[in-house]
Regions:
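Membrane-proximal envelope and lipid/glycan-remodeling enzymes
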Residues: 1-493
């Protein structure tokens, strides 16, 4: 894991917010707007806590991800591998899973997700389901949602069972108390940003792309994972089969959560990062396999182990044989082996620790913008560029990830897309607005829509009556007619 450690460009999208937050600009990506570009609030706060003391993004990324991953692996071994046979089987699954190894670092939230879900599974599968355990399960689930909202889907069946087992008011109260961390965050997000979900959710999910096209892309994501990392999907499928055969309701409920999240990943079109959304499922599936297999080196266990090793070694570029990811089919239907892309410049073993800056064109471009004192640019958001350009550069992100208006406009070229990278046309006059900070958007409907949106993202008075009312109206779709009128006028659908 140490020799394969790397950092993804997307991690620096969050790090720009972290840097602005620590330096007193608030939880903002562009310092003049309150916009949530990160999808993992808990992870962002953990990065911020360490970055406050250590102003080196790579030490923060590597230190935190490796620490959390080591804790996860230790707990996995101590709590779920009760015999040498289970230890060999369990650790073989983790070692031969490219997805798990790749996203146990990367600078993204996956290591924290892994740890929280492992703690949840141990509590749910090993403890008596009394009120106290119920509280802790909902508390851990709250942290899972706080870390990354959609991963909460994995835990829904288990949580529903806890409520069913303890059908009384006390359990509902304990569940509500346990879920307070996430509810507090949602309240903060609503009041600070104006919306309960990250801006990236609106940019990625509100594209107007048909469900059929997204599901087709989701199936490509599954096929891509099978090609690059056959162990992960095999283990996930095997765990569900073994769970059903076990007839243990608790194990079946965990398997149901795994299946639920797997279907969700297909439905949203997967991701552009190969395997990223399957890493937590792999860990949960490994736990289920260990819970449903014998303690000794039986023939089924040996057969399973042999198949996992064979599949792992048959991968196009298995991590266990070579830490250097070769550029093999890096982009397949818009799905990328991200570690292959960034390993040369962003890997722990390749980083220049004297300069502590990766030798990457986006870093150079960011530093050039900063040196020239540029305050505005337009283009797709790249994490490295945005971070190294500094806080004074305002980036109009044509992907919409960091721009609250473009996130709510449909992309163009919807028949050819990369998940999470949907290009938007910049409305006429919007560029002038960003230069002058006066609303010069040409279309009257879009101009009025953005005027209302500006109350949420620019107003200094967070709790003014006008802003609270506008937040309410935006979240019930009150202003959608303005957006629809603009789209009708410009024939953008």
């Amino acid at each position: 894991m140490v020799r394969t450690a790397w950092v993804a460009d997307d991690a620096f999208l969050t790090m720009r917010t972290v840097d602005n937050f620590v330096n007193g600009y608030g939880l903002r990506w562009n310092i003049l707007e309150r916009v949530q570009i990160y999808t993992h609030p808990m992870w962002m706060f953990m990065l911020s806590g360490l970055y406050y003391f250590i102003r080196d993004p790579f030490i923060v990324f590597y230190g935190l991800t490796l620490l959390l991953s080591m804790i996860t692996i230790y707990l996995f071994g101590v709590k779920f591998t009760k015999s040498p046979a289970k230890a060999v089987l369990g650790f073989s699954i983790l070692i031969f899973s490219k997805t798990f190894i790749d996203y146990s670092t990367s600078g993204l939230e996956n290591p924290l997700t892994h740890l929280l879900i492992l703690i949840f599974l141990y509590t749910f599968l090993e403890k008596d389901h009394d009120l106290r355990t119920g509280f802790w399960l909902f508390f851990i689930a709250s942290l899972v949602a706080f870390n990354r909202m959609d991963t909460f889907l994995i835990l829904i069946p288990a949580l529903a069972w806890i409520l069913y087992e303890n059908r009384n008011i006390k359990m509902l109260v304990y569940a509500a108390l346990g879920f307070l961390p996430f509810m507090f965050w949602e309240l903060f997000s609503l009041l600070y940003y104006g919306f309960p979900f990250p801006n990236t959710a609106y940019a990625k999910l509100g594209t107007g792309i048909s469900s059929l096209l997204l599901m087709q892309q989701g199936m490509r994501y599954v096929i891509d994972s099978i090609q690059r990392d056959p162990v992960t999907l095999f283990v996930i499928g095997l765990s569900i089969v073994l769970a059903l055969r076990s007839r243990n309701i608790h194990i079946i409920l965990v398997a149901t959560g795994i299946a639920l999240y797997f279907i969700y990943v297909i439905k949203i079109g997967g991701d552009f990062m190969s395997g990223r959304f399957f890493s937590a499922l792999l860990l949960a599936s490994a736990v289920l396999i260990l819970k449903t297999t014998d303690l000794n080196f039986s023939r089924p266990n040996l057969a399973m182990l042999g198949l996992i090793v064979a599949l792992g070694l048959s991968a196009s570029n298995p991590d266990v044989r070579n830490h250097i990811t070769k550029n093999v089919n890096v982009r397949n239907y818009g799905i990328t082996d991200e570690r292959a892309v960034y390993f040369r410049t962003m890997a722990l073993i390749n980083l220049d620790w004297k300069t502590r800056r990766p030798d990457h064109i986006w870093v150079q471009q960011g530093l050039e913008h900063k040196a020239k004192g540029r305050v505005l640019t337009i283009g797709p958001a790249n994490g490295l560029f945005a971070f190294y350009a500094g806080p004074n550069l305002h980036i109009v992100d044509t992907h919409g990830l960091g721009d609250p208006l473009l996130a709510r406009l449909p992309p163009y070229h919807v028949s050819h897309f990369i998940i999470g990278h949907f290009f938007r046309a910049v409305p006429e006059g919007y560029w002038k607005y960003k230069r002058s900070f006066g609303n010069q958007i040409k279309d009257k409907n879009l101009r009025e829509y953005y005027q209302k949106l500006s109350i949420l993202i620019h107003s200094e008075k967070l709790f003014s009556k006008e802003r609270i009312l506008t937040i309410w109206r935006f979240n019930i779709g009150y202003y959608d007619y303005l957006l629809n009128a603009y789209l009708a006028d410009t024939a953008i659908r």
